[in-house]
Amino acid sequence: MNSTLQNQTKTNLEKVGTDPLDTFPRRHIGPNLQQTAEMLKELGLSSVEELIDKAVPVGIRLKKSLDLPKASTEHKILQNLKGIASQNQVFRSYIGAGYHSCIIPGVIQRNILENPGWYTAYTPYQAEISQGRLEALLNFQTMIIDLTGLEISNASLLDEGTAAAEAMFLAYSVRKNETAKKFFVSELCHPQTIDVVVTRANPLGIEVQIGNHESIELNEDFFGVLLQYPATDGKIIDYTSFIQRSHNVGAISTVAADLLALTLLKSPGEMGADIAVGSSQRFGLPLGFGGPHAGYFATKDEFKRSMPGRLIGVSKDSQGNSGLRLSLQTREQHIRRDKATSNICTAQVLLAVISSMYAVYHGPEGLKNIATRIYKFTSIFANVLKNAGFSITNEFFFDTITIQAGTKVQEILNRAYSKKINFREYKDGKIGITLDETVNLEDLKDLLEIFEIKNTDIEKLFVDVSNVPDSFKRKTSYLTHPVFQSHHTETKMLRYIRKLESRDLSLTTSMIPLGSCTMKLNATTEMYPVTWPEFGAIHPFAPADQTKGYKIIFEQLEKWLCEITGFAGVSLQPNAGSQGEYAGLLAIRRYHESRNESYRNVCLIPISAHGTNPASAAMAGFQVVVVSCDPNGNVDLEDLKAKAEEHKKDLAALMITYPSTHGVFEESVKEICQIVHSCGGQVYMDGANMNAQVGLTSPGEIGADVCHLNLHKTFCIPHGGGGPGVGPIGVAKHLVPFLPGHVLVDNATGNEHGAVSAAPWGSASIVLISWVYIALMGSEGLTNATRNSILNANYIAKRLEKVYPVLYKGKNGFVAHECILDLRPFKKSAGIEVEDVAKRLIDYGFHAPTMSFPVPGTLMIEPTESESLEELDRFCEAMLLIYQEILDVQSGTLDKTDNPLKNSPHTAAMVTSDRWDHLYPRERAAYPASWLKDHKFWPYVGRVDNVYGDRNLVCSCLPIESYQ
C-alpha cells in the first residue's frame, strides 16, 4: 500500500467515531460544504450567516434556536415509528359512513402510490410534460361521468364533504331567484358531510334546513337540495320524484353517491340530478384514518363554467396531434380572485389517478362483480339476522344494514370488540354495519357469531340471493371506453402505468424550480410509513382506544409546529393550503363574533397576493379591499394605513404572504401587523413561503395571529402531481377556541362543529411524512435547510441577473428563497414571450419556473435547499443558452417566427420525421446542451393549443383511434 493511500485510510479511520452515520440533513440538503463555499464566493460573501444577516431583517430574527428533539437517524426513526404504530389497533371496521376498507391492487400500490415518478410531479400546468397523469385524470373524469350518468366531471376535489359544500355554492351561484337563501339537506346524509356544508353556509348567509326529504315542503326560497345515495343508514331510495319536486321550485339537486353502488344501482343522472358528488376512496385507496382520498364532482354541461376544481380537456398540439391540458382555467382563483368558482387549488391528483387505475384494472365487469359480492354478503347477513328475530330498519340496501337490537346492544358491541370488529353506533341504540370488498366467509361467520348465530351454510345461501330489486337496478352501461376493457392482467397494467409515467417530468428527472411551490426532496424514509397497515387500515371514526399511536403523532407534530410558528395551537384538519386559508379566516370570523363584533367583515389583501387569498376571503364572508404595492414590490404602507383607518370600524383582517410573493423579506412587516392590530383587525399570514422562515423567524415573532402551513411544500409531503396536500393552521392563544372541530369525533379542539374537512384530522396518514421529516432534521437541520434555500435562490439570481434582470431585491440587494426574473423586454426586442422560454426549457429537460405570477411576463424561480450545485449550474446554463437563442433572434441569426423557442418543445417524432422544414438544424432543436446526450427527457406532445381546447371542450376519453 503506497503512503498516500495509507494516509488517506488513516484519516478516514480517525474520522469514524461512535456517532451514527445515517444522519439525514446531509442527504436532504443539496450543496456540501465545498459547494457552499463556491456559491458564497460567487455572491461575494464569506459565510452563510453573512447572507442571512443581509437578506433577513434583524428585527424579525429569532433570539434562540428552535426547541425541538435532537435529530434522529433514518434507521432509528423507523424503529421508533414502528413502536408508535404498534399502539394503534387495527380492527375490522364495518362502520361505513362513507369510508370503507378495500383491496389495493399490488401493481397500483407499488407502481403509483409508492413510486416517486408519480408522487413527486407537480400540478400539470405545463401540459407537454404532464401527458401521463393528464390521461389518467381524463380516465378518472370519464369514470365519474359514466357512473354518475352526468355530462361533465372535474379531476377531483378534497373529499366528499368539501364536494358537497362546493355543490351547494354552485347551486347558490347559478340560482335564478336572487332572494332564495335556503338549502335543504337530507337528515340521511353522512353527519360529517352535513357539518362541512353548514360550516360553508354560515359565512355566506345561507340557511341550511336539515330534515326528512319526504315531508319537507319545498318552495321558491330553496335554491338547492342535497341527498345521500345510498343513505347514511344504508337505505336505497329512488329520489326521482323528489328531484322533480325540487326542479319545480327552481332548486338545483345534488346527490352524494357511492361510486361502487352505482355499478348496480340507478345513477343520479337517471334520477334527474343536476350534480353528483362523493368520494372515490373505496376504489383502491387506504382508509388512512381519514385520508387522503379523492372527492369527485360531476354535473350537467350547462354548469361547466361554474364547476369548482381542475378540469382536464382534450386539445391539439403544434403538430395536429391530440394533447391534454387543464381546461377553462379562467374559472380559477388565479384569474377571478374573489369572484372565482372556488378557492381550491391543490386537489387530490395522485388519489384520483389511483382510483382511475383501479377502474382500469378491474373494468366494468370486475367492478360489478365486486359490488355484487358485497351486496350478496350483505343480503345473506340481513336475512339470517331477520330469521333470528332481529329487526332490520332498512328494507332495501346495498352494503349497509341498520339493526334495532333493543336491550342487546351493549353485549353485541362487547362481543364485536372481543373479535376486534367495529360497528357504527347510533345515539338511538341502533347498530349500523357496512360490508366491503375485503369481507370473506370467515368474516361473515364472525359477524353472525357476534349475534349468537352459528352453523349457517353461507355458501348455499350465497347462491340463493336475489338481485337488486328491479326498480333500483341500473339500466345503463358504463366504462365502455377501451381503456377500461384492455388492462386486466398485471403485465398489461404494469406496462400501461409505466407508459404514462414516462410521459411526465417529475423530481426523478430534474429540479422543478417553481416559485412559491417548494418542490424539495420527498425522501424515501419519510414515505415508508404511509402504507403501513397500522396507519393505513384505520377508519377515521374508530374509537380513541384504537388510535393511540396516531394521537402521539398528532400531539408531537402539533407541538413541533407550534414551536416552529411561534403559535399556541395548531389544527391539522385542513386538506390543502386553500382550505387552511379558509379555516384560518373562519377562526378570525368566529373570534370577532365572540366579541360581538360580527360587523367586522373587511379583509385587506395586497394586490400581489396569491389568487387563493381573495377567493378564500370571499368564502369566509369577507369583503375584499385591495392594498397597493410600492415600486419595490412591498406593501404600500401609506395605502395600508389609509385603508385600515378608513375601515377601522369594520376591519376584520389583513392577509399577507411572508416573505412576500415578490421574493423578498419586507423590512416593515412588523409595522404592517401593528397598523392592522391598532384598527381592531387580525393578521392572517399565508404560509406558502414558510420555507424561508423555519428557524430564522416565525409568524408569531413577526406579529401574525394565524398562519396556514403547506406541509406539501415546507414539510416534505410530495405534491402528487397536483395533490394531496395538507394545510394545517397555527393560531395565537386567543384564536385557539375557534379552530375547526368535528361532529363525530373529539379532535382535541373542544369544538363539536365547524369542520372544514370530512375527517377529524383531515389527511391523517400523510402527516406522518412531515413528522418524520422534522424528527430527522432536528432544529439545526431545519434551520440549515432554510439557510440553504436562501443561498440557492441568491446563487441563481446572481448567475442570471446580468441577462435576466431580477425584478425585486431586499434593501441589501439579496432575495429570499426565490427570485423573479424579468423577461418582458424580450417581447419587444425579439418577439419572444415568457411562454416561449418556459416551453424551451422542456427541451433542456426542465420544468419551467412559475410563469407570470405575481408579475406578468416574468419567471419566479425557487430552487429549494435540496438541489446540488451541479443541478443549479445546469439550470443556469440552460437559461443562459436560451438567452443566447433570444440574442440570435434579435440579430437575425434565427428567424423571428421559425426558431427553436417558438416551436418548442420538440418531440422525438418531430426531430426524427422524414420532413424537416425549419430554419435551424434538428440537433439544435433536440440537443441544445451537451449534457442532454447523456440523458434526455422527451415530451410526448408538442406545444398544446390552449385556445382550441377551450373552444372545443372535450373532457372525457377520446375514441381509441386517437391513442394509436
Curated annotation (Swiss-Prot):
InterPro entries: GcvP, GDC-P_C, GDC-P_N, GDC_P, PyrdxlP-dep_Trfase, PyrdxlP-dep_Trfase_major, PyrdxlP-dep_Trfase_small
GO MF term list: glycine binding; glycine dehydrogenase (decarboxylating) activity; pyridoxal phosphate binding
Compositional bias per record (Polar residues), positions renumbered to this chain: 1-11
Positions of the UniProt region annotated as Disordered: 1-21
GO-annotated biological processes: glycine decarboxylation via glycine cleavage system
Modification N6-(pyridoxal phosphate)lysine occurs at: 713
Enzymatic reactions: N(6)-[(R)-lipoyl]-L-lysyl-[glycine-cleavage complex H protein] + glycine + H(+) = N(6)-[(R)-S(8)-aminomethyldihydrolipoyl]-L-lysyl-[glycine-cleavage complex H protein] + CO2
Keywords: Oxidoreductase, Pyridoxal phosphate
Cellular component terms per the entry's GO annotation: cytosol; glycine cleavage complex
Enzyme Commission number: 1.4.4.2
Cofactor: pyridoxal 5'-phosphate
Subunit structure: The glycine cleavage system is composed of four proteins: P, T, L and H.
Database matches in NCBIfam families: gcvP, PRK04366.1
Family that this chain belongs to: Belongs to the GcvP family.
Role noted for this protein: The glycine cleavage system catalyzes the degradation of glycine. The P protein binds the alpha-amino group of glycine through its pyridoxal phosphate cofactor; CO(2) is released and the remaining methylamine moiety is then transferred to the lipoamide cofactor of the H protein.
Protein name, entry field: Glycine dehydrogenase (decarboxylating)
Organism taxonomic ancestry: Bacteria, Pseudomonadati, Spirochaetota, Spirochaetia, Leptospirales
